[in-house]
């Protein structure tokens, strides 16, 4: 029975006032409380939730969770630090040598942190003059504007949209495809399941908890990762994890975490743990599939009705093709460190009951990262439960509000990314001189070091251009990409780099022109509440005026467009609040007749509008019901165990069906493990969103060790190396080195280390090879493409060694502004 809006809001209010937070959040969020007298508190949103903020004398003095957020995250403690951080970019700055010599500067000096303060007019003139030089002297192939990154929340102030629209009004450029989170998955899964899946709504948690008998979290840690979302997050999924914890305790469901480490999810749920050697998931899956086949446990009817290509995959599984090796449990046991009989029992368990497989993203962030997702889909198909309530496969239940039924309401649109119909750029040059207009995002360093080289990518040929200029806005490229010293060498090839941000990230430090954007808390905006659940619309009310000399991206790029006569076209003759109102009213119009939304003035004063939760839903249920009427988006319309299309590409590292490929480096007896015996896992952090909030001193004090990023290490490994909890440690390989703090924990097995990604790269100096003083794992990670198919990031293919740091450690360099010098 559907409830009225009045009853819905009444129930939400009651829950907000009385709901006890789950145990794993209580300790973190003792500060959280219902926001009494909310009229005294402004409302805004962030990736880590909606908040109320108290402002006195033009300064944020207190922050509380939004009263309808039942499970707020500790990350909101970092909001004040983000606004008032020592790392704030206060004024437009230009690198000293670039200001002297422009595009003829010594680019090896990038990163020496010497900048000259200039006025906004001077900075934007320099920016515009460089755009002119590039388009007049070279053309669109010389300008790189690939801007993959999380940006800040807010539909209007989406910084990437502003940059692409504004620069696009001047001329064309080279952009990127894919992203750093799901690069391999989002390429392989459309071939196999017909959609990217990694960003698709999944079976509702309610149904999983009701119908699943086995729930397998495979390299998935929702307790840690559900704290954040692309839009303003609701955190509703935590209520289902709390219910799941109770079901595990009552032995009503069998839950297993398959992982090299004991995750926060495994510890919170108190569920079973299946250790597996890092990077060996495909071998384990193949052995499970082999057991299902030889013991006649697989669903033949499902394979016949809903898949294609099983007969072409089977010879490989049985050792009759390719390497002539039978992929049985004995074979996998030597690779995975799981006993052969345990593998067989695991397969029988999966087949014996209703099983929901839930995969995380980490296993596709490695070399041959396409294979785990492809083979995982084959495994799910052999179980025959895809499209059943409580069964099948998911690639995203650790992310955002996936699994929370969508309300069905339309959400606000965004500031337009592209030019309007009929608009033309100042330089409408589409001649790329034979170079590619789009490259895979994770190959930017290679493209800089190897201009003119042609590579394979997803059935096409990509040719790198010799870029002269790059623009980054609202993203930290020196966090997400791999192999810092290689990046230093590559970025020296660029003549000019422009960065727009609110903090002095490493990306800004290695730039030439740096423009200070304001934080999302210094501007007005609007955002969806619940990236997938669509539970409402949040007003992002400006908390304080932009600090120092910062401006919104809208104002920055509007002023840039004024320099070439496109200001009015860029902003459509609307200011900030007119745009916010426009986006809201368009959303209101789209929801008319389905959901009541008040006029804008009423909405803005209240700060939010909420919608009821939608109806529970099962992913792929319609396909299962009628595979012809609801065909998948694959070439055949079915699940493709064998892909004729991929096979036709002729790639040696990604063939027509899923396979086990050895890695360039792998721990626990794999390649290069004799020299570098530790696998370095760069997991998503617990108390920040990638590199966002790393500048928060309040949050860093809760996890940093001697002011360094913590390196999680097994007690026996630490003891053997003479390391105790709290020591400084040097972690290193042939690619780089960093100083970190030892966090000894038995959640990590021998030979496995973790440095959380997003740690701000803080090199001792600008020179290639200099030590990172804080602990960015991508200082050491391997910069190679996943395969010729996706060419995605391979950060989790990374071996290192460690030793106790001896002597006086250098100070951390990354959390303050530049050395301001005079010209």
UniProtKB/Swiss-Prot annotation:
Cofactor(s) listed: Mo-bis(molybdopterin guanine dinucleotide)
Functional note: Reduces trimethylamine-N-oxide (TMAO) into trimethylamine; an anaerobic reaction coupled to energy-yielding reactions.
Keywords (A to Z) from UniProt: Metal-binding, Molybdenum, Oxidoreductase, Periplasm, Signal
A Gene Ontology biological process term: anaerobic respiration
Lineage top rank: taxon: Bacteria
Cross-referenced InterPro entries: Asp_de-COase-like_dom_sf, BisC, CT_DMSOR/BSOR/TMAOR, Molybdopterin_N, MoPterin_dinucl-bd_dom, Mopterin_OxRdtase, Mopterin_OxRdtase_prok_CS, Prok_Mopterin_Oxidored
Gene3D superfamilies, per database record: 2.40.40.20, 3.40.50.740, Dimethylsulfoxide Reductase, domain 2, Dimethylsulfoxide Reductase, domain 3
GO molecular-function term, one example from the UniProt record: molybdopterin cofactor binding
Catalyzed reactions: trimethylamine + 2 Fe(III)-[cytochrome c] + H2O = trimethylamine N-oxide + 2 Fe(II)-[cytochrome c] + 3 H(+)
EC supergroup of this enzyme: oxidoreductase
Cofactor binding note from Swiss-Prot or TrEMBL: Binds 1 molybdenum-bis(molybdopterin guanine dinucleotide) (Mo-bis-MGD) cofactor per subunit.
Entry comment on modification after translation: Predicted to be exported by the Tat system. The position of the signal peptide cleavage has not been experimentally proven.
Residue numbers binding Mo-bis(molybdopterin guanine dinucleotide): 181
Protein name: Trimethylamine-N-oxide reductase
Organism: Pasteurella multocida (strain Pm70)
Cell compartment(s), UniProt: Periplasm
GO-annotated cellular components: outer membrane-bounded periplasmic space
EC number, as in UniProt: 1.7.2.3
Signal sequence, start to end: 1-32
Protein family: Belongs to the prokaryotic molybdopterin-containing oxidoreductase family.
